[in-house]
């Protein structure tokens, strides 16, 4: 288990991370962590590793791009003084290019995405024990689908930055691809973006695997 006793884990991202979390701080009980993968991760950490007392904060904001993360990074990440930061961003960076094709000011193209994400990781790396980079995803099994193809490019950037900075890497697209061998995309997300309960569990499982969570741990 890579996250240690009493350490603080902060999640940041878009609506997939947000999932109705409390404002201003997504921390605590009674739905404060939202209803998505963050809540599932916390539930399993508390159930299986209660002695670690890992503190979790959700700072996801629906609709965000990496550009938005940069604007709020100091307040929502650095000032929180986390031990670990998990970043999953990029879906809206890509999606706006397809659902709002003529509003180019909302598009975050690959070069800006890469430069901004790398800058945030490099700025934060010396201040924390570890960074976990999760790829954006598109719940579509056809790799030739235009938006899926673009999303894969952004995912490759995340992998490259993770390798460059020795960050943990969670390939969420690969996790979905495995389940898509059996299930139709609509079973996991009506719009191929916002996951169902099963979709969020896929994300949680992929995340937990990367941090060394032991599913068969006996206590």
UniProtKB/Swiss-Prot annotation:
pH-dependence of activity, as noted: Optimum pH is 7.1-9.2.
Outcome following mutation: residue 190 to P: Significant reduction in catalytic activity and modification of the quaternary structure as a homodimer
GO MF annotations in UniProt: acetylxylan esterase activity; lysophospholipase activity
GO BP annotations, alphabetical order: xylan catabolic process
Pathway, per record: Glycan degradation; xylan degradation
InterPro entries in alphabetical order: Ester_Hydrolysis_Enzymes, SGNH_hydro, SGNH_hydro_sf
Reaction equation(s) it catalyzes: Deacetylation of xylans and xylo-oligosaccharides
Function of the molecule: Acetylxylan esterase involved in the degradation of xylan, a major structural heterogeneous polysaccharide found in plant biomass representing the second most abundant polysaccharide in the biosphere, after cellulose. Cleaves acetyl side groups from the xylose backbone units of the hemicellulolytic polymer xylan and xylo-oligosaccharides. Hydrolyzes about 20%-30% of the available acetyl groups on fully acetylated birch wood xylan. Completely deacetylates xylobiose peracetate (fully acetylated), and is active on both the alpha- and beta-forms of the sugar.
Subunit and interaction comment: Homooctamer, presenting a unique donut-shaped quaternary structure built of two staggered tetrameric rings. The eight active sites are organized in four closely situated pairs, which face the relatively wide internal cavity.
PANTHER family: SGNH HYDROLASE-TYPE ESTERASE DOMAIN-CONTAINING PROTEIN (PTHR30383:SF5), THIOESTERASE 1/PROTEASE 1/LYSOPHOSPHOLIPASE L1 (PTHR30383)
Family under the similarity heading: Belongs to the 'GDSL' lipolytic enzyme family.
Protein name, per record: Acetylxylan esterase
Source organism phylogeny: Bacteria, Bacillati, Bacillota, Bacilli, Bacillales
Name of the gene encoding the protein in the UniProt record: axe2
């Amino acid at each position: 288990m890579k996250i240690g006793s009493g350490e603080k884990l902060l999640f940041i991202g878009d609506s997939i991370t947000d999932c109705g979390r409390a404002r201003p701080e997504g921390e605590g009980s009674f739905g404060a962590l939202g209803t998505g993968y963050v809540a599932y991760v916390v539930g399993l950490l508390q159930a299986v590793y209660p002695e670690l007392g890992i503190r979790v904060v959700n700072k996801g904001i629906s609709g965000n791009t990496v550009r938005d993360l940069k604007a709020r990074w100091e307040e929502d990440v650095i000032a929180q003084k986390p031990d670990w930061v998990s970043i999953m961003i990029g879906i809206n960076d890509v999606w706006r290019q397809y659902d709002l094709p003529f509003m180019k000011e909302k598009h975050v193209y690959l070069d800006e995405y890469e430069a901004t994400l790398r800058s945030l990781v490099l700025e934060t790396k010396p201040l924390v024990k570890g960074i976990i980079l999760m790829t954006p995803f598109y719940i579509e099994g056809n790799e030739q689908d235009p938006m899926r193809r673009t999303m894969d490019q952004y995912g490759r950037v995340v992998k490259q930055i993770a390798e460059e900075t020795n960050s943990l890497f969670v390939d969420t697209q690969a996790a979905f691809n495995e389940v898509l061998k059996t299930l139709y995309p609509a079973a996991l997300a009506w719009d191929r973006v916002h996951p169902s309960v099963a979709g969020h569990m896929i994300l949680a499982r992929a995340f937990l695997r990367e941090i060394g969570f032991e599913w068969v741990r006996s206590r």
